[in-house]
């Protein structure tokens, strides 16, 4: 926008027999949305000046607003942008504990160090000190390039959003007389595509006299779908043309289940059960203790024979 850059305004002043010093003072300073006007005069010293001297004032008028200056009440201009708020993950001052558990940039656990020592080590390595677990006792912090870490997190999040909103169509081609190895390769590729959330189109091309083996091609496609199992459902198929195909759509419920990692406790219990069962199989049965022999009854004493009496 056009504006007045500078102009000179004169005035007459009468000074007689006095000494007067005029300090530098801004007579008028206004900043608005449309115009910024500043009127000022420099420091002057007059001693016994003759009447009617001409002094010059510099008037600068500029359109387009600007920073600083006086703001009228009701002026809704946007102020200067505030400093970026500190990310909570970088706010080390929020840690009340004097010690922290430190992890370096190479994923090595350095153990317990003082908070000041952790800050110093991060500064020496020219890395950011990021809070991983603020509620732990003591809190866990890590040295890393936080801007790079956030970029990778945002990129990973965008990729996940793309997968949820967009579904690509992957094509797999094979002949009716494909060998077992090539068939297994295509089967694994289809399983991977389906787990990534993409559709899979399996095509069997029939050329020339191969059309006579149409039934074999149909059985091959049915076998392929059967071995995919519950990982996908059939969306459409075409067994009439020379290029026969079947389109499989991923089953979201079956895809989510493998992504849930088993907890350590479950893994340990499974290992314990397996080891216990193996021990039961390999362990020999302990011999039963032999019964103790019953004590034999003591023989009763024989009665003494009565003495014979002989009559004389």
Swiss-Prot record:
Domain of life: Eukaryota
Compositionally biased region (Basic and acidic residues): 253-263
Gene3D superfamilies: Translation initiation factor 3 (IF-3), C-terminal domain, Translation initiation factor 3 (IF-3), N-terminal domain
GO CC annotations, alphabetized: chloroplast; vacuole
Record family assignment: Belongs to the IF-3 family.
Summary of the function given for this chain in its UniProt record: Chloroplast translation initiation factor that is essential for the coordination of leaf and chloroplast development. IF-3 binds to the 30S ribosomal subunit and shifts the equilibrium between 70S ribosomes and their 50S and 30S subunits in favor of the free subunits, thus enhancing the availability of 30S subunits on which protein synthesis initiation begins.
Name this polypeptide is given: Translation initiation factor IF3-2, chloroplastic
Species this chain originates from: Arabidopsis thaliana
